């Protein structure tokens, strides 16, 4: 699988588009807002003389969420400046995603964004006719590598992106007295599960650790000393990588695929060969890589649960949510649409565009049945880091 080519959300404004099915991701951005505001306040307080701030949103995607994080950042800086008795700095904003992302959608949304910024911020440096401004640019490329000039950024944000890997993991194998890489042996699955071999678990963990180290090292070159990052992404609370919150959405999708294979609609060998470029890391893994890379200190690390539809969950409401059968099936369809908007471009090259409707109809039913007997949750990592130096 060429991850750079297929890792993008469903484009456009259709019923299966990411633009129409990204409420969960929007809620994850909102979940991290408090930590982001806190980090921005600390950044502004420690850089009182700075007149131009470099900001990057990594993995911005497309659709209504693509400018949500940046809007929040601009609003927070605008609200902080009067309290800190300082002028609003010039904001250099970079929106990043892979080249396959629908940047046309983002560009078409920018005039409305600029109008809102200018209309809301006149008199504080954002108005028309001069003064400090907000400049937005697109930067296509993988964040698993350098994207920006050295020490050009002050604040980096990323939401719902770092659980995606740079490539499908490979396993190590012995051949003629030498170690080689080989495809994973993960029969009947599309992600690690309780029945996956330990070699698959190890390969996924190693790929994430390698990618996250590269991500940190790349950002360490681009951020100024004292610069900050706020990252939110799917993770897990358990050391076990096969718990429900870290892998069960993939387990149910594999069930839908296998049901189609048994009916001869798709080939089972294609399921065996497909592995999702995804990993839900534990806090222990994150701390280990951050310490090993050595350029950042952890200011805050939180893990918050949300349900599969994107709703936040308090500790008091963590018990099973009772749903009627129609409610459960409706939830299953909403979750299926959300997952489809994200993973369909990955699945199509292997299984074919013509089976996608049938696949996600089955997936919706399977997820709906699961909602009837369970209340599945994701674990959202919210990580605030400070560049050392």
Curated annotation (Swiss-Prot):
A GO molecular-function annotation: methyl jasmonate methylesterase activity
Keyword Calcium carried by entry: no
Enzyme class: transferase
Reaction(s) this enzyme catalyzes, per UniProt: jasmonate + S-adenosyl-L-methionine = methyl (-)-jasmonate + S-adenosyl-L-homocysteine
Annotated GO biological process: fatty acid biosynthetic process; jasmonic acid metabolic process; methylation; oxylipin biosynthetic process; response to wounding
Pathway noted in the entry: Lipid metabolism; oxylipin biosynthesis
EC number per UniProt: 2.1.1.141
Residues noted as binding S-adenosyl-L-homocysteine in the record, renumbered to the chain: 18, 60, 65, 97-98, 142-143
Residues reported to bind Mg(2+): 186, 272, 274-275
Localization in the cell: Cytoplasm; Nucleus
Stated family: Belongs to the methyltransferase superfamily. Type-7 methyltransferase family.
Protein name: Jasmonate O-methyltransferase
Organism: Arabidopsis thaliana (Mouse-ear cress)
